[in-house]
Regions:
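Residues forming the flavin
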Residues: 1-53, 57-183, 187-530
């Protein structure tokens, strides 16, 4: 196959034109191209008067490929490599995966395809049950600490924008994207420069992945929470599990620990049992909402109506040495209630696949290091998160309403009494206040400098009517569960800390990739034991 890069089309142009452009680049006739698929697509909006899409396509052509690529500097011969999946004999003691977010799901998929018949323990419910409970909570219903945005099938990423872009360049990424597409996501996620699925589609995709895992001999147990572990001669030997019918012991010699960044009781249990872990830097801040049409105009100008909902990514390093950045930007989305503990409030952002909501939202986060934590213990960052969420719960009225403030009032140091042009989307509701009374000064001082700095980079970002909803505390794990080069815990052989909760990923795709890596290590260990 020949890959041809830097082919350009105007917004709205028929992608069938790519065949003609590819033929022109290779100096052949369009009918000489026997096959074409898009390998990458990105939007170049750097120049307002020349906004266009840039494509890389893969083509098969009649003729000698080596000779043809010499005709075009943007062409190269490529050969896609399939992700290798070994086959093993079914082990006597089945591998166990704790958690069924992206890391646990892709670990289970690989182990199931390899014939290892994994058992998945997920403390939350299946995606359909979870969706109904979250909708009821957002409408004012009761909070469930085991069924929420953090816990349940698909993990926290299911109720987000479903963004799949990642800063890593692991070869496994192509496999992850292809599997999402094969299980119900749109094909364009395999080539978009900024792929996203959307919550509405992702809820279906994760169920399809689960069905394949079960069809291949795996087992998924919902409502099963790990409460302890035991070892034999230093090696993991069993898990204590709280299930719907009571507590039980599950023998296990290979355990992938993919618990997510919000399983605080599990962090405490692991720490109490001596599993090596350490505090790590993470970030906290607020969610900011603008009208999506204002972001579109700022990014695209007059071309906005012909283009999809605009996104942004901003960062700044401030004179006092602090830094801030935007994260998990959700075009046309909503701010979501993301609490996982009773008596706490925290936020997240989500978008559906169409990204057609009135508002844009993003986290505005302040980078925090262990030396910033009031509590210097291993779990000090986690306890700081919890205390801020509890303060927000109280300031919001004790009913899971979130504290909110207009950006103009925040910068002026006065409490807000209601919305302006931007209507908040957080449900069950917001309580207008002064966020300086909710968040630590370490965070508010940095945000007060960052908002105007971002406004200089993106017109209108510091719009006085922009809504700040707090707190955003769960951007990443506050701890790292230490593992070695074999991906095993340095203190408990057979235990594989994995994904975002263990401190080795940040986002859906990188977590899924880490799940594959850990599953590969488990398969290697099982083959050595055979």
């Amino acid at each position: 196959m020949i890959a041809i890069s830097n082919l350009k089309l105007a917004p709205g142009a028929d992608e069938a034109q790519l065949r003609t452009l590819a033929a022109g680049a290779l100096k052949v006739q369009p009918q000489d191209i026997t096959g074409l698929r898009i390998r990458k697509k990105s939007l170049d909006a750097r120049k307002r008067d020349d906004i266009h899409y840039v494509y890389t396509v893969g083509v098969t052509v009649r003729g000698d490929e080596r000779k043809l690529v010499r005709r075009c500097r943007a062409a190269a011969i490529v050969q896609d490599k399939a992700y290798p999946i070994p086959r093993i004999a079914s082990p006597q003691t089945r591998p166990v995966i704790v958690g069924f977010g992206p890391a646990g799901m892709f670990a289970a998929l690989l182990l199931a395809r390899a014939g290892a018949r994994p058992i998945v323990l997920e403390r939350g419910p299946d995606a359909q049950t979870r969706s109904a409970q979250i909708a009821a909570f957002r409408a004012g219903g009761p909070f469930d600490p085991e069924c929420n945005v953090q816990f349940g099938e698909g993990g926290a990423g299911t109720f987000s924008d479903g963004k799949l872009n990642t800063g890593t360049h692991d070869a496994r990424i192509g496999f992850v994207l292809a599997e999402f597409a094969a299980h119900g996501a749109p094909e364009h996620i395999t080539y978009d420069a900024k792929p996203h699925i959307g919550t509405d589609v992702l809820v279906e995709v994760v169920q399809n992945l689960r069905r394949e895992i079960i069809d291949r001999g795996g087992e998924v147990r919902f409502g099963h929470r790990v409460t302890g572990l035991s070892t034999e001669d230093g090696h993991i030997a069993a898990l204590t599990v709280a299930g719907p019918a009571g507590s039980y012991t599950l023998p296990a010699r290979q355990v992938i620990l993919a618990i997510g960044h919000s399983a605080r009781d599990t962090f405490e249990m692991l720490h109490a049992q001596g599993v090596p872990m350490e505090p790590k830097p993470f970030s906290m801040g607020v969610r900011i909402e603008h009208r999506q049409k204002d972001i579109n105009a700022a990014q695209y100008g007059a071309a906005a109506e012909r283009l999809p909902a605009a996104d942004y990514s901003l960062s700044c390093h401030l004179p006092d040495g602090s830094s801030a950045y935007t994260f998990c930007m959700c075009p046309g989305g909503e701010v979501f209630a993301a609490a996982s503990e009773a008596g706490g409030v925290c936020t997240n952002g989500m978008s559906n696949s169409r990204r057609d909501g009135e508002n844009a939202n993003a986290a505005v986060l302040v980078t925090l290091r262990p030396e910033d934590f009031p509590d210097k213990s291993t779990l000090g960052g986690m306890y700081w998160q919890r205390s801020i969420e509890q303060r927000a719960f109280a300031r919001g009225g004790g009913n899971y309403h979130a504290p909110a403030q207009l950006a103009g009032d925040f910068l002026a140091g006065r409490a807000s009494t209601g919305p302006g042009r931007v209507q908040p989307t957080y449900r069950p509701g917001v309580t207008w206040c002064d966020l300086h009374d909710v968040l630590p000064a370490r965070i508010t001082d940095t945000l007060a400098q960052a908002l105007p700095a971002f406004g200089r980079k993106l017109r209108g970002f510091d719009d006085p009517d922009a809504v700040l909803t707090a707190p955003e505390t769960r951007s990443s794990s506050p701890v790292r569960i230490v593992r070695g080069e074999d991906r095993c815990s340095t203190g408990v052989p057979g235990l594989y800390p994995c994904g975002e909760g263990a401190g080795y990923a940040g986002g859906i795709t990188s977590a899924a990739v880490d799940g594959l890596r850990c599953a590969e290590s488990v398969l290697a260990a099982l083959q050595n034991e055979a």
